Amino acid sequence: MSKNKFLFTSESVSEGHPDKMCDQISDAVLDAHLAQDPHAKVACETVTKTGMIMLCGEITSKAVVDYQVLVRNVIKKIGYDDSSKGFDYKTCNVLVALEQQSPEIAAGVHVDKDIADVGAGDQGIMFGYATDETEEAMPLTLLLSHKLNYKLHELRRSGELEWVRPDSKTQVTIEYSSEGGACVPLRVHTVVISTQHSPDISLEDLRKELIEKVIKVVIPGNLIDNDTVYHLNPCGSFVVGGPMGDAGLTGRKIIVDTYGGWGAHGGGAFSGKDPTKVDRSAAYAARWVAKSLVKAGLCRRCLVQVSYAIGVAKPLSVMVFSFGTSALNEAELLKIVNDNFDLRPGMIIKNLDLKRAIYEPTAENGHFGHNDFPWEQARKLKIDKDLRAKSKGPALVDAIGIAH
């Protein structure tokens, strides 16, 4: 392999994976509260194992929510409607251990404060990442992994592949070329799919259908060659799945939720948290910033870090890194960010309109790369004349290969 070539791998999991199931339930709880009370403060964790769901956390809200009905509806939508599939929404036990948010946190963060002065709900570091290797400004390794799971979901729902069950995992390895800090996909090196299935399909037929109806439909033909490796249900039979096979917990798929191992991650999960929790809202804002810079042609790759202290509105630090793909230096890129984005939590919530019931879909197939989400709408940037002139200079032309 050439010194400028490298392999990178990302994974995804389906909506029926136990951890993702918990993420969706936590976000369904959040949405139910925000739909009735946009100012609700929600921190809801979900745990699942065979025949059991438990909600735990802190919620302060005027909403009235029937958790029994809500949880069962999410499980039904996912497709767990019989114990033979690993779970049954009709017979499972739903336990609720939800309490009020700490009044000390409320007083320090949001009570009697103007929106611009709302403090961060906790300390922490958050990252946003974007790359020009796909139209969605997402890493192709993760994008294809998500799409493989979604195609399985579609074929199961339509009945075309009746043997497919809700729990699955995918993984894609891509051979890249490094070009001046930018990443250019060359070919798909390896595809891994492990999907739960009914007991009446042979492994041979399962693998054949995965290749013909999933992989060949999802992955562009020009990226697959005779050397592409396939591991399809490599462990063999996968009948026992869902919570019967593994316990599930909210917030355990944070790399699947974000960039598939690219960029960086601050460690905070998203699901079940209202937007005053900067683990969520600031990570969305950092993605918004990174994507806006890439889509504006200011860099080909971008990593943004932001940090906060609990109860403090202004970020402690903001960092922009372009991996050498910009004609501008990091200080100049940061000036553009500061001129165009207000990263105080209250202003993030206002500008992205985050006090809405929009979160359950984010827990299904990744929080980024879907144009329906407001943080995926690249902002048109105001750039002063000198920086605009420099951004069209030789360094960027050389990196991108085209003149702007």
Curated annotation (Swiss-Prot):
Q: Binding residues for L-methionine, per the UniProt record?
A: 58, 101, 246, 277
Q: For binding ATP, which residues are annotated in this chain's numbering?
A: 17, 167-169, 235-238, 246, 252-253, 269, 273, 277
- Where are the annotated coiled coils located? none
Q: Which UniProt keywords apply?
A: ATP-binding, Magnesium, Metal-binding, Nucleotide-binding, One-carbon metabolism, Potassium, Transferase
Superkingdom, natural source? Eukaryota
Q: Which NCBIfam families match?
A: metK
Q: What HAMAP family does the database record attribute to this sequence?
A: S_AdoMet_synth1
Name of the protein described by the UniProt record: Probable S-adenosylmethionine synthase 5
Q: What organism does the record attribute this protein to?
A: Caenorhabditis elegans
